[in-house]
From Swiss-Prot:
Record's GO cellular component terms: cytoplasm
Amino acids binding Mg(2+): E87
Family designation: Belongs to the IPP isomerase type 1 family.
E.C. number(s) listed in UniProt: 5.3.3.2
Organism: Escherichia coli O9:H4 (strain HS)
Name of the gene encoding the protein in the UniProt record: idi
Name of this protein: Isopentenyl-diphosphate Delta-isomerase
Residues that hold Mn(2+) according to the record: H25, H32, H69, E114, E116
Summary of subunit composition and partner proteins: Homodimer.
Catalytic activity: isopentenyl diphosphate = dimethylallyl diphosphate
Principal subcellular localisation of the protein: cytoplasm
Stored Pfam families: NUDIX
Keywords linked to the UniProt accession: Cytoplasm, Isomerase, Isoprene biosynthesis, Magnesium, Manganese, Metal-binding
Protein backbone atom coordinates (compact mmCIF):
# COMPACT_ATOMS: atom_id res chain seq x y z
CA UNK A 1 0.00 0.00 0.00
CA UNK A 2 1.24 3.49 -0.82
CA UNK A 3 2.30 5.90 1.91
CA UNK A 4 -0.75 7.37 3.60
CA UNK A 5 -1.15 10.93 4.75
CA UNK A 6 -3.56 12.67 7.07
CA UNK A 7 -5.42 15.83 6.12
CA UNK A 8 -4.61 18.48 8.71
CA UNK A 9 -7.46 20.72 9.87
CA UNK A 10 -7.76 24.07 11.60
CA UNK A 11 -10.03 24.53 14.63
CA UNK A 12 -13.01 25.10 12.32
CA UNK A 13 -12.38 21.81 10.49
CA UNK A 14 -11.01 23.43 7.32
CA UNK A 15 -8.14 21.54 5.61
CA UNK A 16 -4.77 23.27 5.97
CA UNK A 17 -2.38 20.69 4.49
CA UNK A 18 -1.24 17.09 4.78
CA UNK A 19 1.32 15.16 6.79
CA UNK A 20 2.59 11.58 6.50
CA UNK A 21 0.38 9.37 8.72
CA UNK A 22 3.08 8.00 11.02
CA UNK A 23 4.79 11.38 11.39
CA UNK A 24 1.42 12.91 12.28
CA UNK A 25 0.70 10.64 15.25
CA UNK A 26 2.93 11.77 18.11
CA UNK A 27 2.54 13.19 21.61
CA UNK A 28 1.62 16.49 19.90
CA UNK A 29 -0.73 15.23 17.17
CA UNK A 30 -2.33 18.03 15.17
CA UNK A 31 -6.06 18.00 14.48
CA UNK A 32 -6.73 15.92 11.37
CA UNK A 33 -9.49 14.14 9.46
CA UNK A 34 -10.28 10.47 10.05
CA UNK A 35 -13.25 8.12 9.87
CA UNK A 36 -14.65 5.29 11.95
CA UNK A 37 -16.86 2.46 10.69
CA UNK A 38 -19.07 -0.16 12.26
CA UNK A 39 -19.60 -3.18 10.00
CA UNK A 40 -22.50 -5.60 10.30
CA UNK A 41 -23.13 -8.97 8.66
CA UNK A 42 -26.43 -10.19 7.18
CA UNK A 43 -27.48 -11.42 10.65
CA UNK A 44 -27.11 -7.91 12.07
CA UNK A 45 -24.01 -8.82 14.10
CA UNK A 46 -21.26 -6.23 14.62
CA UNK A 47 -17.68 -6.99 13.64
CA UNK A 48 -15.47 -6.16 16.63
CA UNK A 49 -11.76 -6.23 15.80
CA UNK A 50 -8.66 -6.36 17.97
CA UNK A 51 -5.91 -4.09 16.72
CA UNK A 52 -2.63 -5.78 15.77
CA UNK A 53 0.16 -5.56 18.34
CA UNK A 54 2.29 -3.80 15.70
CA UNK A 55 -0.07 -0.78 15.59
CA UNK A 56 1.56 2.48 16.74
CA UNK A 57 -1.41 3.54 18.89
CA UNK A 58 -3.62 1.32 21.04
CA UNK A 59 -2.02 -1.99 19.98
CA UNK A 60 -4.03 -5.06 20.98
CA UNK A 61 -7.13 -3.03 21.90
CA UNK A 62 -10.65 -4.12 20.89
CA UNK A 63 -12.43 -1.61 18.69
CA UNK A 64 -15.14 -1.09 16.13
CA UNK A 65 -14.59 -2.67 12.74
CA UNK A 66 -12.33 -0.31 10.73
CA UNK A 67 -10.91 3.17 11.18
CA UNK A 68 -8.59 5.21 9.02
CA UNK A 69 -7.87 8.47 7.25
CA UNK A 70 -9.26 9.72 3.94
CA UNK A 71 -6.59 10.78 1.48
CA UNK A 72 -6.53 14.14 -0.28
CA UNK A 73 -9.33 14.21 -2.86
CA UNK A 74 -10.96 11.03 -1.49
CA UNK A 75 -14.45 11.06 0.04
CA UNK A 76 -14.93 9.63 3.52
CA UNK A 77 -17.16 6.91 2.04
CA UNK A 78 -14.50 5.89 -0.50
CA UNK A 79 -11.91 5.85 2.30
CA UNK A 80 -14.11 3.49 4.35
CA UNK A 81 -14.39 1.14 1.36
CA UNK A 82 -10.62 1.30 0.71
CA UNK A 83 -9.69 0.52 4.31
CA UNK A 84 -12.26 -2.28 4.59
CA UNK A 85 -10.63 -3.93 1.58
CA UNK A 86 -7.11 -3.37 2.95
CA UNK A 87 -7.65 -4.33 6.61
CA UNK A 88 -10.36 -6.97 6.26
CA UNK A 89 -10.29 -8.00 2.59
CA UNK A 90 -14.04 -7.42 2.54
CA UNK A 91 -16.55 -5.75 0.25
CA UNK A 92 -19.27 -3.63 1.86
CA UNK A 93 -22.51 -1.84 1.06
CA UNK A 94 -22.28 1.95 0.62
CA UNK A 95 -21.38 3.42 4.03
CA UNK A 96 -24.17 5.30 5.81
CA UNK A 97 -23.48 8.29 8.04
CA UNK A 98 -24.20 7.61 11.72
CA UNK A 99 -22.40 10.37 13.64
CA UNK A 100 -21.09 12.96 11.15
CA UNK A 101 -19.72 15.48 13.65
CA UNK A 102 -17.81 13.15 15.99
CA UNK A 103 -14.57 14.74 17.20
CA UNK A 104 -12.25 13.48 19.91
CA UNK A 105 -8.83 13.67 21.48
CA UNK A 106 -7.32 10.76 23.40
CA UNK A 107 -3.86 9.69 24.54
CA UNK A 108 -2.78 6.05 24.48
CA UNK A 109 -0.61 4.54 27.25
CA UNK A 110 2.59 5.14 25.24
CA UNK A 111 1.81 8.86 24.91
CA UNK A 112 0.60 8.82 21.29
CA UNK A 113 -2.29 11.26 20.83
CA UNK A 114 -5.27 10.90 18.52
CA UNK A 115 -6.80 14.29 17.72
CA UNK A 116 -9.43 13.77 15.06
CA UNK A 117 -12.54 15.02 13.36
CA UNK A 118 -13.85 11.51 12.75
CA UNK A 119 -17.23 10.98 11.03
CA UNK A 120 -18.76 7.61 11.93
CA UNK A 121 -20.30 5.25 9.36
CA UNK A 122 -22.13 1.92 9.30
CA UNK A 123 -22.15 -0.61 6.46
CA UNK A 124 -22.86 -4.27 5.80
CA UNK A 125 -20.32 -6.79 4.62
CA UNK A 126 -21.12 -8.45 1.30
CA UNK A 127 -18.22 -10.90 1.10
CA UNK A 128 -16.15 -13.13 3.36
CA UNK A 129 -13.41 -11.62 5.52
CA UNK A 130 -9.75 -12.02 4.54
CA UNK A 131 -8.00 -10.46 7.52
CA UNK A 132 -4.75 -8.51 7.10
CA UNK A 133 -2.69 -9.64 10.11
CA UNK A 134 -0.66 -6.41 10.01
CA UNK A 135 -3.84 -4.55 10.97
CA UNK A 136 -6.07 -6.97 12.89
CA UNK A 137 -4.93 -9.71 15.30
CA UNK A 138 -8.39 -11.08 16.10
CA UNK A 139 -12.06 -10.45 15.42
CA UNK A 140 -15.49 -11.57 16.53
CA UNK A 141 -19.03 -11.16 15.20
CA UNK A 142 -21.14 -10.00 18.15
CA UNK A 143 -24.66 -8.93 18.99
CA UNK A 144 -24.62 -5.12 19.13
CA UNK A 145 -26.58 -5.03 22.40
CA UNK A 146 -23.94 -7.29 24.01
CA UNK A 147 -21.13 -5.05 22.76
CA UNK A 148 -22.84 -1.90 24.02
CA UNK A 149 -23.38 -3.57 27.40
CA UNK A 150 -19.69 -4.55 27.45
CA UNK A 151 -18.64 -0.98 26.65
CA UNK A 152 -20.87 0.37 29.43
CA UNK A 153 -19.56 -2.19 31.95
CA UNK A 154 -15.86 -2.23 30.98
CA UNK A 155 -14.97 0.83 28.89
CA UNK A 156 -11.25 0.27 29.56
CA UNK A 157 -11.41 -2.88 27.38
CA UNK A 158 -12.24 -0.91 24.20
CA UNK A 159 -10.68 1.88 22.17
CA UNK A 160 -11.54 5.34 23.50
CA UNK A 161 -13.13 6.40 20.21
CA UNK A 162 -15.44 3.37 20.25
CA UNK A 163 -16.45 4.15 23.84
CA UNK A 164 -17.12 7.81 23.00
CA UNK A 165 -19.11 6.94 19.88
CA UNK A 166 -21.21 4.42 21.80
CA UNK A 167 -21.86 7.02 24.52
CA UNK A 168 -23.69 9.27 22.05
CA UNK A 169 -27.39 8.43 22.36
CA UNK A 170 -28.27 9.34 18.76
CA UNK A 171 -25.36 7.30 17.34
CA UNK A 172 -26.34 4.38 19.56
CA UNK A 173 -29.94 4.59 18.34
CA UNK A 174 -28.87 4.73 14.67
CA UNK A 175 -26.43 1.82 15.08
CA UNK A 176 -29.14 -0.27 16.74
CA UNK A 177 -31.59 0.52 13.94
CA UNK A 178 -28.93 -0.31 11.33
CA UNK A 179 -28.17 -3.66 13.01
CA UNK A 180 -31.86 -4.62 13.08
CA UNK A 181 -32.52 -3.70 9.44
CA UNK A 182 -31.47 -6.85 7.57
Amino acid sequence: MQTEHVILLNAQGVPTGTLEKYAAHTADTLLHLAFSSWLFNAKGQLLVTRRALSKKAWPGVCTNSVCGHPQLGESNEDAVIRRCRYELGVEITPPESIYPDFRYRATDPSGIVENEVCPVFAARTTSALQINDDEVMDYQWCDLADVLHGIDATPWAFSPWMVMQAANSEARKLLSAFAQHN
